[in-house]
Amino acid sequence: MVYKSIDDYKMVVHNSSIIINHCKLTDFPTLIRQFGVWDKVCHRVNYIGIHYDPEKQRLFLPRGIDVDYVRRKVESTMDPDEFSSYIARYNHYDKVSKRIRMKMLPRDDVQKEALNFGLCKGKYYCNSGKTQFAINLTTGKGKTYIASCIMSYLGIRSIVITSQSGILDQWREKIKEYTDIDDSEIVKIEGGPMIGRILNDSSMMANKSLYLCTHSTLQTYGSTHGWDKVGLLFEKLGIGIKFFDEAHQNFQNMALIDFATRDVWRTYYITATPSRSDRQEDIIYKLYMKNVPSINLFNPEVDAHTSYIEIK
C-alpha cells in the first residue's frame, strides 16, 4: 500500500501526541475507559487527557502513555496486515533573533540538577532524544530561572503558557532580570483578534524570541476557530519549545494544546505540585505523564509542599 500523506497511517506518533486515524471513539473501550472521570452532578462520564475529532475521525492520545500498549489495542480491532504506523519527527522551528545570555549562574545544586536534566547533560544524556520533560520544583526554587537558562542555551523560539495574565507579566520581568533579552523581543499574545492578525501576517512577529500566552486565550481561540488554528499559530511563529507553568492546572486545556502543537520540538512541564486534587483526575494526570522523563527536586524536610486529601 502506498501512503500519500501522514493521515493515511493508522497510528502516528508525534512529539506530544499519538493520533489514531480513521476510527470511532467506541473502537477502543478499554483504552478510553482509563481517561474517564465520573461527573457526580450530571451523572455521566467525562473524558480528560484525550480528544476525539468526529469530523476527521481522529483520536488524540497523550504521548506519555505506552506506545506499544496503544499499538496492541489498535491492532486488535483490525487485520494486522492492514495496520500501519509512522513516527513524525518534523522539528521545524526558528532560532531566537539574537543570542540570549544569562546574567547569573545557578544559585545552588538544585538549580544545577534541574538544568542538567532539562538540557540532557551528564547522567541525563540518555534523554536527548526525548521531546517532553517534567521538572517538579518547589515554588521559590527558580522555575523561571530554569526556563530562562534552557531557552538561552538552546537558542530556540519559545512560548510560556500560564493560567493568568498577571503571572505572564511576572515571567516577563523575571526573564529580563535573569537574561539580557530586550523587552521588544518578548511578545504577549492577548485575545483572539491578535491571533487572527498573526495568522494573516506572521511577518508582524519577525525578530521575536519569546511569546507569552494564557491558557484561556488559546482555549477560547481553539474552541471558536478550531484547534488546528492553534497549531498553525505555533508553526507560523516558529516556536520550538513550550513551557507549561504549573502544569497540573488547566489539565485538559494543556492536553488540547499538546495535541494541537504536537510537532513542537520540546515541551517542558514545570510545576511545584505534580498532581491533581481530585483522585480520579490525578490517576489520569499520572497516566498522561507516565513515560515523560521527570525529576522531583523536593526536599520534604525543608520545602513546604502541598498534599491534597479528597473529602467525599
Where in this protein do the model-derived segments appear?
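N-terminal accessory nucleic-acid engagement/regulatory domains that precede
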Residues: 1-80
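Conserved pre-motif I regulatory segment
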Residues: 76-135
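The Walker A (P-loop) glycine that initiates the GxxxxGKT/S ATP-binding motif of P-loop NTPases
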Residues: 135-137, 246
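Conserved Walker A/P-loop ATP-binding site and its immediately adjacent core
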Residues: 139-178, 217, 276
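Loop/turn-to-beta-strand initiation segments
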Residues: 157, 207-210, 238-241, 263-268
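Conserved RecA-like helicase motor-core motifs
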Residues: 181-198
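Conserved helix/coil segment N-terminal to the catalytic DExD/H
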Residues: 193-238, 252-257
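Post-DEXD/H (motif II) to motif III coupling segment of the RecA-like Helicase ATP-binding lobe
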Residues: 241, 246-308
